[in-house]
Amino acid sequence: MIKVIERDGKVRLPFSRGILTRSITSVGVDVDLAYAIATEVQEELIRQGKKVVTKEEIRNITYQKLVEKGFKEEAKRYLFWRRFRKLKIPLIILLGGPTGVGKSTIATELAFRLGIRSVIGTDTIREVMRKIITPELLPTIHTSTFLAWKELRGTVTGSPIIAGFESQVNAVAVGVNAVIQRAIKEGLNAIIEGIHLVPGFIKIDYEMAFMYMIVARSREELEARFYERTRYSKRSAQYYISHLDEIMEIQEYLIKKAREYRVPIIENVELEKTISTIMEDIMEKTVEIMKKKGLDMLEEPK
C-alpha cells in the first residue's frame, strides 16, 4: 500500500485513485479518462518502488501525465488549483441571477469540483429573516421577489416591480453581507447563490471574493427551464411562467447593475461551459493577485 504524507511527514493516508480522479475531473477531464490517468499515476509510483509519497510528487506526476496526453490547458488548471488549495486562502464565490436560471445547480457543481463544503442560498437567509421579522414590519420579504412590489407602501418612482425587488434585496443583503464577513473572518471557503446578490447591495471588499451574474439567453429558454424545474419543485411551472414578464424585467435590471459594477455576465446555456468559464476567470484573476505578491501559481514543476 502506498501512503501519502505531507512535507512534514505528519499525515499518512492511503493513496486513492478515487480522490485523484476527482481532482483531475475538476479541471474538465472526462471521468473515464481521469480514472485512467489516476491509474497510470498509481502504476508509476509502484514502478518506482514508492511506499511513501508526498502530495507534491503525486501532483507533479499527474501534471506530466496530463501534458503527455495533450491536456496542456487542463494540466495548467490542475497545477493551479492544487497550489491554491495548499495556500489555504478563503475563496468566496457569489452567483447572482434571476429566478430559474440555474444558479443552484451551478453552485452545487462548483462546490463538488473545488471541494467547497459550504453552499448557501439567499432564499435560506430570507427564510430565516421571515421568522424574525413580521410581515407588518417588513412585508416585502414575505413574498416572492417578483411579487414584492404588491407589498410596497407609499408612492413609487419608476418601475414598481424593481422598487419592490430592491426593497427585498436591501433587507436580505444585510444577512448576506454578514455571512460573507463571517466566512472571511473564519477562513472558510463559501459559495453563495441567489437572486438577492445584486451588485451595489453586496459588499465585496475582499480580493478573493468573485461575483458572477448568471442569466438566461432568452425568454423562451427561461420558460423551458421552469418546465424542467417541475421535476423536483413543488410549485408548478405555471406559477413562474405567469410572472415571466416580471422575472424578465428583473433580469434586465440585474444585467444593468452587473455592467455598472463590472461584474461578469454569463449566459447559462451549457452547464459545463458555465462552470469552465467561472473557474477559468477565478484562476486568471487569482494568478494576477498572487503574482503581485511574488508567487507564480503556474510555474511548471521541475
UniProtKB/Swiss-Prot annotation:
User: Enzyme group, top EC level?
Assistant: transferase
Q: Which UniProt keywords apply?
A: ATP-binding, Kinase, Nucleotide-binding, Transferase
Q: Which domain of life does this protein belong to?
A: Archaea
Ranges for domain ATP-cone: 2-89
The reply on keyword Transferase is yes
For this protein, what reaction is catalysed?
(2R)-2-phosphoglycerate + ATP = (2R)-2,3-bisphosphoglycerate + ADP + H(+)
Question: What is the role of this chain?
Answer: Catalyzes the phosphorylation of 2-phosphoglycerate to 2,3-diphosphoglycerate. Involved in the biosynthesis of cyclic 2,3-bisphosphoglycerate, a thermoprotectant.
UniProt xrefs under PANTHER family: P-LOOP NTPASE DOMAIN-CONTAINING PROTEIN LPA1 HOMOLOG 1
The family classification in the record reads: Belongs to the 2-phosphoglycerate kinase family.
What's the protein name? 2-phosphoglycerate kinase
Species name: Pyrococcus furiosus (strain ATCC 43587 / DSM 3638 / JCM 8422 / Vc1)
Taxonomic classification, please? Archaea, Methanobacteriati, Methanobacteriota, Thermococci, Thermococcales
Q: Which gene encodes it?
A: pgk2
